[in-house]
């Protein structure tokens, strides 16, 4: 099951879930991509998102406005839907309208092999890595996440040296091996790191839970600001959304 948590009052770009992406609301575009891989449900926090989904025949459920993270919203949706404890759950973002089908499939495969949860990352350049809106991740020898940050990591102390490892940009999608793991993560107390960086995945690392990271090739970009949307619409065309 794929669940897309959709919050109307985003702090950086209010109402972005309903922004038009080549004739479809952003969240609907995301859901149509997800439906190419598995059954998808949008976990809404507002009737306006529900109505937009229903208009385009996208399955949706109404959840609380008071969740601290998209993961918590996914759990409520899973409970409303009555998912079985052993069912895998993918958490895709409602602000990734250009995410390729192959990336979702890669996440699904990684989730099957991950003991706890999985996510994806892609190689980025130095200039991209400077943006705090693009989260960076560093990995251990088994491709498990060591840390996620809005800062540039790993930091290259010797400026004239050549990087030995690529810079990795996190793609904010998650796969949980089963519903019970989703429940386990949400039951953990929030930690100071996730609050400092505003990155919910740091809760798992703080409590020593493994996050397997699948490195993928992707041209997708998350839409965090109005400027992101304007730039994306210049880069992408409707034909590219058929990938």
UniProtKB/Swiss-Prot annotation:
Kindly report, in one word, the top-level EC class recorded for this enzyme: transferase
InterPro entries given in the database record = Cytidylyl_trans, KdsB, Nucleotide-diphossugar_trans
**Where is it located?**
Cytoplasm
- Give the Enzyme Commission number: 2.7.7.38
Disulfide bonds listed in the record: none
Pfam families xrefs: CTP_transf_3
Name assigned to this protein: 3-deoxy-manno-octulosonate cytidylyltransferase
From the broadest rank down, the organism's phylogenetic lineage runs: Bacteria, Pseudomonadati, Campylobacterota, Epsilonproteobacteria, Campylobacterales
**Primary gene name:** kdsB
